[in-house]
Design a protein with these regions (language model features):
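Acidic, polar-rich low-complexity tracts and alpha-helical solenoid repeat scaffolds
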Residues: 1-185
């Protein structure tokens, strides 16, 4: 009688949410997936899908979430725009937490998948450049800052020029440094 009762779907969702609150993510993921598969199309299934999305974003596994959603035939799923946002937000969260290696990897995935033309291309390029800078991977940082410096009117253009100039000067590439210093004057 339990699986067919009118409160079973709600209980399954609540159990998944409890696991999530306890940070038992593997149990939460398993429970949410069971809720989605058992009660497909229900409000609880959609809530479980939202909770899964949040777990995968928080744990920097958004590609795994996207792959999972592609296996679901009977539910309205993510569009390319929401994939764009999910990958960006996941990388941004890693950046804000100071996890620059993970942020750089996430933003690089975003840039390769959605740019040019993605909603967050300029911001993703900026955060990628700063992540590489924080990791002291200066050649990769210069590459990203250069991409920013070439986009007229973006809010990061001056900072990108300054970073390129400073890094080039430190590398004794004085002509490049002078060029970017002059662009700012």
């Amino acid at each position: 009688n339990y699986p067919n009762s009118n409160v079973a779907a709600k209980a399954s969702l609540e159990m998944g949410m409890t696991y999530r609150t306890l940070k038992q993510y593997d149990n939460a993921i398993e429970t949410f997936k069971t809720t989605i598969n058992t009660y497909t199309g229900s409000e609880e299934a959609y809530s479980s899908l939202e909770n899964l999305e949040q777990i995968f974003v928080e744990t920097n596994k958004v590609e795994e979430y996207i792959a999972y959603t592609k296996t679901l035939d009977n539910m309205q799923l993510q569009t390319a725009n929401s994939e764009d946002s999910l990958i960006y937000v996941t990388a941004e969260l890693q950046y804000m937490m100071g996890n620059y290696r993970e942020a750089a990897a996430g933003f690089t995935t975003y840039l390769k998948s959605f740019c040019p033309g993605g909603r967050y291309c300029i911001n993703a390029t900026y955060y990628t450049a700063n992540s590489f800078y924080q990791l002291e991977q200066y050649d990769q940082a210069i590459e990203q800052y250069s991409a920013l410096a070439d986009v007229q009117g973006n809010p990061y253009m001056e900072e990108a020029c300054m970073r390129i100039a400073e890094l080039s000067y430190d590398k004794k590439e004085y002509r490049t440094a002078l060029y970017y210093f002059q662009r700012m004057s």
